[in-house]
Structures are given as structure tokens and as C-alpha cells.
UniProtKB/Swiss-Prot annotation:
Pathway: Metabolic intermediate biosynthesis; 1-deoxy-D-xylulose 5-phosphate biosynthesis; 1-deoxy-D-xylulose 5-phosphate from D-glyceraldehyde 3-phosphate and pyruvate: step 1/1. It catalyses: D-glyceraldehyde 3-phosphate + pyruvate + H(+) = 1-deoxy-D-xylulose 5-phosphate + CO2. The keyword Transferase applies. PANTHER family: 1-D-DEOXYXYLULOSE 5-PHOSPHATE SYNTHASE-RELATED (PTHR43322), 1-DEOXY-D-XYLULOSE-5-PHOSPHATE SYNTHASE, CHLOROPLASTIC (PTHR43322:SF5). Its EC number is 2.2.1.7. Binds 1 Mg(2+) ion per subunit. Binds 1 thiamine pyrophosphate per subunit. It is an enzyme of class 2 (transferase). One of its GO terms (molecular function) is magnesium ion binding. Mg(2+) binds at residues 144, 173. It comes from Mycobacterium leprae (strain TN). The lineage of its organism: Bacteria, Bacillati, Actinomycetota, Actinomycetes, Mycobacteriales. This is 1-deoxy-D-xylulose-5-phosphate synthase. Its cofactor is Mg(2+); thiamine diphosphate. GO terms for biological process: 1-deoxy-D-xylulose 5-phosphate biosynthetic process; isopentenyl diphosphate biosynthetic process, methylerythritol 4-phosphate pathway; terpenoid biosynthetic process; thiamine biosynthetic process.
Length: 643
């Protein structure tokens, strides 16, 4: 049946039984397609009936449907003409794992960061009103814990102020990645209890109505008591007191009930909340049995069992998790903070060991950072574990609440650099540029597991300002021993015997291994290369400047945007001490990159050892000639320059 659904209008003629059959078919397809590519399975299994109802009630794209945390949009894609493309999900040139304006007119925003849909909806509704299109509804689907984000409440405050037709669907599955934390979650949980409570009152009413006059009096008394109790217990007042109408709670897996609620909401003509209760992972036993995350995300797996098809190697997150627990066993002042992602950031095990020292603040990165500042003021050493892409959301708090006060807060930045298959919204290529302008900030980029443990310990020993440690997604690189350590810098390779100190190659973090491969290629061409890992990459340490003075060309190699990254910092530092060795930066052009594997993105950007070696050879030739010993001349223009 799904093959016959090419556009939302094709749903209109289906019977309720056909809709139930279609929902089952969609779930089966979701499991098999996501099992083959990896992706967000649990959230999409939970919104099948809801998405069917949305497209039967509203006229997309005339009525925009905006998915907050856009990983809930797989079913939406299936119903808007993209079902046949799911074999390419999250692959290069294939279907995005999030809404994509390039894919379909039904996708209004490239949504993937949480708590933004209501603000988009508010703006669209205002635009439609100004254009005289008040018959257009805007639907925002908010779920997976997004209401724990403060931006949602800022938007609700504005949406409620005017009678524009905004329908806010709260997809309440009680979870983000893990169970949703906080007062809003508790309020919604109370609302979920109300249907049973209402049914009990209905039975009491029927019994009392069967009695003579005394029954009518008793019913009126009970109804007045009920109203008082409900007013005191109903968290729907959170919404109605703002001026928003409220419909629900509704069983999110009863398509007809959801459709009735949505039609009712559509008829109001103003802002309304539709509270839909769903189960993440619905209909797939392995997901339902996953108590921790209900298979929020999965890699390639066996669709029958839900088990991964290959044994995962130790990754960066696991190494960090183990190291942090080790340090915390020795120091009671170490605490950890996560913004609704204890599992993905490696803090679940920490919480099991130290339940009173892990704080899950919900999807609230700004609050997480300022709360960390408060903990540091109270003589704790907080570790904020966060994805690089989400660190952007807390920049003001890092600057004004942490750094201004010189507080010892350690930020552990996971998924730094190119992450790949999740696309432009999840690449962590901005953090070095952002943190580089924060006064007093010290940033480390470990090249391997040994250095991660080592640099985490060093960060935890800092008591006079903020620190950050960044590492990428995926398996840990092989350990790379240093030949020696000089002024805080690890020297990983030196020119072969007989070659001059032509190039100083600065490998940042995991790019140290690429730097060694590049050096080998250059050595084979007679170019002498020293490879170093600065370890603490920002601010630029004296060891880098000392070595820069003795080489003829400096090249930095980093998985960050070239604007404002380590290369730019090295160039600035050289100018400040009047070292005129030319500097070239190899990194990521400041652009948004479509989803593909990490290796595919890097190859497309020319960030392979072969391509980088070729570029450096060109610079060496342009600047002069290389040679051995004293006959090696100084290269060309005597200035620091970033490319």
C-alpha cells in the first residue's frame, strides 16, 4: 500500500483499517531500511500514526509542518514522495536523515537542533498574516524532550500573544535520548494520568444519575470537587494560563483519535496545544525492550534481533567515560553535567557510579554552562560533556558566566570535526574558532587514547579558568608515541638524516596521524619535515614558536574551519613575536557540508595525506628550494599568512 502513496493527498481516501495496515507497513519498512543504513529508529517508530493524521488533516506544504528535532521526520518523508529513496538514507548524495529543503517542498526547515520549531512557526504565522494568508495553518511538532529547552518557552510566550493559527503538537514520549528530566516532564506525566481519572469519574456520574434526586445533588457536588482537584493538579494550566487552548491528552497510536483532536485544533483558528502521548520504539520489540534509549539511534544491525552486525571498537566517548570515572574516584569535587544526552556523551556509567554527582539538565545547553559556573563557584570541578555542534548554543554563557569569572569548568567536546552522515547541522567544525576568542580559555586536542586520559587529568588540575578537550566521533586512533616533549609540545617526527628543517607540520588532534603520513611522502621527495602535536592547541604555546623560528615553512593541519582556527592563531602568535616564517593552514573551508561518511567528506575537501602532501610540495616550490644542511635557502615572502 505504501508504494501507492506518492503525496499526502493519497491518504484521504483510506479507511481506518487501511490506515492501520499502512501504519504496520511503515513500521516494517522503517526497521528494515534503518537497519541497513543506521539512523534514528525509535523516534520514528513512535510517530507513525501521528504523521498519518497530520497529513490527513493539514494541507502540506500550504500548511507548513515543522518537525522539531527533525530526526522524527522519516515517516513524513515516506508520505511526501521519498519512500523509494530510503536505501540511500544518510549516504552521500542520498536521503538526508533530517528535513531537507533541497529534497522536498514539504520540508520547510533543515531542523535538527532541538527547541527551534516553535520560533519558526511563530515567524511563519506572522509572515502569512502580513501577506493576508490567515487561512494557512502552521504546525509545529515538538517532542523528544524539546520542551525542556528554554527557547520553546520564549516562543510560546510570543505565540500566545496573538490569535494566529499555530497548532503545536506535543509529541510526549517522555524522552529525549534517555527519559526526559525536569519539571515540564513531570507536568506532562501528570497529564498522561488523566484519561484513566476521567474514565473513573464518568463511571461515577453514570451510577449517580441512575439514582433519584439525591443522585443529581451528589453528582453536582462531585463535579465541583472534581473541578477544584483538576485545577490544582492539571499541568495543562501551564499552557492555558498563557492563553493557549489545549486539546488532549490523546493516544498517539490511535490514528482516528489523533485526527479528531487535530481537526478540533484546526477549527479554533488560533494558537492551540495538542498533547499526543506516544511510545518511542513502538511496534519493534528490540526498541521497546531498550530501557535506556528505546533505540533512539542505531548503527547497521540485524533487523530481526536489533543487534549490531559488527562488534564496536573502543571509541573516543568510551575512553573519556572510563577516564573520568577513574579521576572521580580519587576526587569528590568532580561532577558531570549533560544536556539530555548522558548515553551519547559517555556519562551514563559515571551516573551509575556517582548518581548524586551527575546532573542531566535537559535540552538546555545555556543553563548547563551557567549551572556549571555555579558549581565551580561552590568549589566543585564540573565537567560539561557536550557535542561540538551543541556547544555553539552556550557561547554567551561560556564567555560571560564562566570565563569572565575565571572559573574551573572543563568542557569535553565530543563529535568535533566532520561527523559525516548526520550532515551540516552536526559537523563540529566551529568550536576551535569560537573558543579561541574566549579570554583565558585553554583547549586540548588529544591525538590518541593515552593523550585523552592525560589531557583530561591536566584539565581537571586547572583551577584558575576554563578548559576544553575536543575529540571526534568514532574509533580511537592507534597510539602515537612522541620522540620527545619540548616546551609542552610533542615531537612526533624529525627530518631524515641529511635533510634540512624545511617544514614544521603541526598536526592538531587526530590529524596528527595524517601529518605523519604526509611527512613520509614529503621525505620521499627530499623535503625535511618536523611533525609536532601541540597537545594544548589554544592558546599557542611557546614550544610551537620556538620550533617555528628554526623552520622555513609552517603548515597547520586541523579538522576545524580555517577561519579562526589553530592555523590562524599560530599566524597571529608569530606576528606578535616578530617571527616571519611563512605559515599555511590546511583545514575545513567555512561551509556547510552535506551528509556523507567522514572519509568521503574529507576526500572531497582534499584532506587526505596524498592531497595535503601535494599542496605542501607546491608551497615549497613556490617559496624557493629545499635541500640539505646549509644549502637550504629561506623560503620566499617573509610573512605569516593563512590560506
Amino acid at each position: 500500500m505504501l508504494e501507492q502513496i506518492r503525496r499526502p493527498a493519497d491518504l484521504q481516501h483510506l479507511s481506518q483499517q487501511q490506515l492501520r495496515d499502512l501504519a504496520a507497513e511503515i513500521r516494517e519498512l522503517l526497521v528494515h531500511k534503518v537497519a541497513a543504513t543506521g539512523g534514528h529508529l525509535g523516534p520514528n517508530l513512535g510517530v507513525v500514526e501521528l504523521t498519518l493524521a497530520l497529513h490527513r488533516v493539514f494541507d502540506s506544504p500550504h500548511d507548513p509542518i515543522i518537525f522539531d528535532t527533525g530526526h522524527q521526520a522519516y515517516v513524513h518523508k515516506m508520505l511526501t514522495g521519498r519512500c523509494q529513496d530510503f536505501d540511500s538514507l544518510r549516504k552521500k548524495a542520498g536521503l538526508s536523515g533530517y528535513p531537507s529543503r533541497a529534497e522536498s517542498e514539504h520540508d520547510w526547515v533543515e531542523s535538527s537542533h532541538a527547541s527551534t520549531a516553535l520560533s519558526y512557526a511563530d515567524g511563519l504565522a506572522k509572515a502569512f498574516e502580513l501577506a493576508g494568508n490567515r487561512n494557512r495553518h502552521v504546525v509545529a511538532v515538538v517532542g523528544d524532550g524539546a520542551l525542556t529547552g528554554g527557547m520553546c518557552w520564549e516562543a510560546l510566550n510570543n505565540i500566545a500573544a496573538t490569535p494566529r493559527p499555530v497548532v503545536i503538537v506535543v509529541n510526549d514520549n517522555g524522552r529525549s535520548y534517555a527519559p526526559t528530566i525536569g519539571g515540564v516532564a513531570d507536568h506532562l506525566a501528570t497529564l498522561r494520568l488523566q484519561p484513566a481519572y476521567e474514565r473513573l469519574l464518568e463511571k461515577g456520574r453514570d451510577a449517580l444519575h441512575s439514582l433519584p434526586l439525591i443522585g443529581q445533588i451528589a453528582y453536582r457536588f462531585m463535579h465541583s470537587v472534581k473541578a477544584g482537584i483538576k485545577d490544582s493538579l492539571s499541568p495543562q494550566l501551564l499552557f492555558t494560563d498563557l492563553g493557549l487552548k489545549y486539546v488532549g491528552p490523546v493516544d498517539g497510536h490511535d490514528e482516528h483519535a489523533v485526527e479528531v483532536a487535530l481537526r478540533k485544533a484546526r477549527g479554533f483558528g488560533g494558537p492551540v496545544i495538542v498533547h499526543v502521548v506516544t511510545r518511542k520504539g513502538m511496534g519493534y520489540p528490540p526498541a521497546e525492550a531498550d530501557q535506556a534509549e528505546q533505540m533512539h539511534t542505531c548503527g547497521v544491525m540485524d533487523p530481526t534481533t536489533g543487534q549490531p552486525t559488527k562488534i564496536a571498537a573502543p571509541d573516543w566517548t568510551a575512553i573519556f567515560s572510563d577516564a573520568l570515572i577513574g579521576y572521580a574516584m580519587k576526587r569528590r569535587d568532580i561532577v558531570a553535567i549533560t544536556a539530555a544526552m548522558p548515553g551519547p556523551t559517555g556519562l551514563t556509567a559515571f551516573g551509575q557510579c556517582f548518581p548524586d554527582r551527575l546532573f542531566d539538565v535537559g535540552i538546555a545547553e545555556q543553563h548547563a554552562m551557567t549551572s556549571a559556573a555555579g558549581l565551580a563557584m561552590g568549589r566543585m570541578h564540573p565537567v560539561v560533556a557536550i557535542y561540538s555542534t551543541f556547544l555553539n548554543r552556550a557561547f554567551d554563557q561560556i564567555m560571560m558566566d564562566v570565563a569572565l569569572h575565571k572559573l574551573p569548568v572543563t568542557m569535553v567536546i565530543d563529535r568535533a570535526g566532520i561527523t559525516g552522515s548526520d550532515g551540516p547541522s552536526h559537523n563540529g567544525m566551529w568550536d576551535l574558532s569560537m573558543l579561541g576568542i574566549v579570554p583565558g580559555m585553554r583547549v586540548a586536542a588529544p591525538r590518541d587514547a593515552i593523550r585523552l586520559r592525560e589531557e583530561l587529568g591536566e584539565a581537571l588540575d586547572v583551577d584558575d579558568g576554563p578548559t576544553a578537550i575536543r575529540f571526534p566521533k568514532g574509533d580511537v586512533c592507534e597510539d602515537i608515541p612522541a620522540l620527545k616533549r619540548r616546551s609542552g609540545v610533542d615531537v612526533l617526527a624529525v627530518p631524515a638524516t641529511g635533510l634540512a628543517q624545511d617544514v614544521l607540520l603541526v598536526g592538531v588532534g587526530v590529524f596528527a596521524s595524517m601529518a605523519l603520513a604526509v611527512a613520509k611522502r614529503l621525505h620521499n621527495q627530499g623535503i625535511g619535515v618536523t611533525v609536532i602535536d601541540p597537545r594544548w592547541v589554544l592558546p599557542v604555546c611557546d614550544g610551537v614558536l620556538e620550533l617555528a623560528h628554526t623552520h622555513k615553512l609552517i603548515v597547520t593541519l586541523e579538522d576545524n574551519g580555517v577561519n579562526g582556527g589553530v592555523g590562524a592563531a599560530v599566524s597571529t602568535a608569530l606576528r606578535q613575536v616578530e617571527i616571519d616564517t611563512p605559515c599555511r593552514d590546511v583545514g575545513l573551508p567555512q561551509e556547510f557540508y552535506d551528509h556523507a561518511s567522514r572519509s568521503e567528506v574529507l576526500a572531497d575537501l582534499g584532506l587526505t595525506d596524498q592531497d595535503v602532501a601535494r599542496r605542501i610540495t607546491g608551497w615549497v616550490v613556490a617559496f624557493g628550494h629545499c635541500g640539505s644542511g646549509d644549502d637550504a635557502g629561506q623560503y620566499g615572502p617573509r610573512s605569516s599568512q593563512t590560506m
